[in-house]
């Protein structure tokens, strides 16, 4: 397959549109230049959220993670068992949570602030959302957020097996046109990738305000055996959990009269 054809297929199947919105302010540009390289994950290197050796001492002085800029275009294969064992030994018992498509970042930042002993990995392809989170990282002195500005599938390939204790996919683009539904993020392929990186007993939370998408999600889960739906009654998917902060998008959905579905699944 030619590189041109492979690129066109990747663009056709991605679950997001254009990455850049309006021109960043001077401060936002400075955050992208100075802060993003210190919190961005480098997918060209083995799984490492807490650096070791000299880099660990440097990071302790700076109060942040890797000082190297992320390679946002070239994913690496999954790390070897030896690399994974070494990094988990360095990280100790620290939990890692993953949010795919964090949008404006309100949920990601809230979880980071309320769970300081957890490392939050946020994945978002759009610059506007990344800049908002970088602003909160700088203003609130948050040290437990790591970012990937790119395709979520790249980070799901990069993460080691059974490394994530909780994952969030909140109100992803529903791609309402029938011809575009193959772009929907929650699909059997993505579920298989999530199943690989999530620990047994880990919780996966998915939110949507589109009834058709909710049905599609439940159909995808019913066709696999890696996750079980935690709902025991209607209130379990109609009522937002107390530790699920309401975002501006959810508030807009409520104002417009759209039903919000709060779906929780457990990795078995």
Residue ranges and their predicted role:
Residues 157-166, 171:
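A short acidic, Gly/Pro-enriched loop at the edge of an enzyme's catalytic core
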Residues 53-58, 84-85:
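Glycine-biased, low-complexity coil/linker segments
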């Amino acid at each position: 397959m030619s590189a041109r054809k492979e690129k066109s297929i990747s663009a056709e199947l991605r679950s997001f549109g254009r990455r850049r919105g309006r021109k960043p302010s001077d401060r936002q540009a400075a955050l992208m230049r100075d802060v993003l390289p210190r919190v961005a994950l480098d997918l060209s290197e083995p799984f490492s959220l807490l650096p070791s050796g000299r880099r660990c001492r440097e990071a302790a002085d700076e109060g942040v993670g890797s000082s190297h800029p992320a390679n946002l275009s070239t994913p690496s294969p999954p790390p070897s068992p030896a690399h994974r064992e070494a990094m988990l030994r360095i990280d100790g018992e620290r939990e890692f949570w993953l949010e795919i498509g964090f949008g404006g970042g309100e949920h990601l930042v809230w979880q980071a602030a309320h769970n300081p002993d957890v490392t939050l990995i946020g994945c978002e392809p759009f610059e506007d959302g990344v800049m908002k989170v970088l602003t909160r990282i700088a203003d609130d002195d948050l040290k437990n957020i790591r970012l990937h500005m790119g395709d979520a599938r790249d980070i799901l390939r990069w993460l080691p097996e059974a490394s994530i204790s909780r994952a969030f996919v909140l109100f992803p683009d529903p791609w309402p046109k029938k011809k575009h539904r193959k772009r929907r993020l929650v699909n059997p392929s993505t579920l298989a990738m999530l199943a690989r990186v999530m620990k047994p007993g880990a919780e996966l939370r998915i939110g949507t305000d589109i009834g058709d998408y909710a049905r599609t999600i439940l159909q995808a889960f019913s066709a696999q055996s890696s996750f079980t739906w935690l709902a025991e009654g209607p209130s379990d998917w109609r009522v937002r959990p107390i530790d699920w902060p309401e975002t501006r998008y959810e508030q807009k959905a409520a104002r417009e009269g759209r039903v919000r579905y709060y779906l929780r699944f457990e990795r078995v």
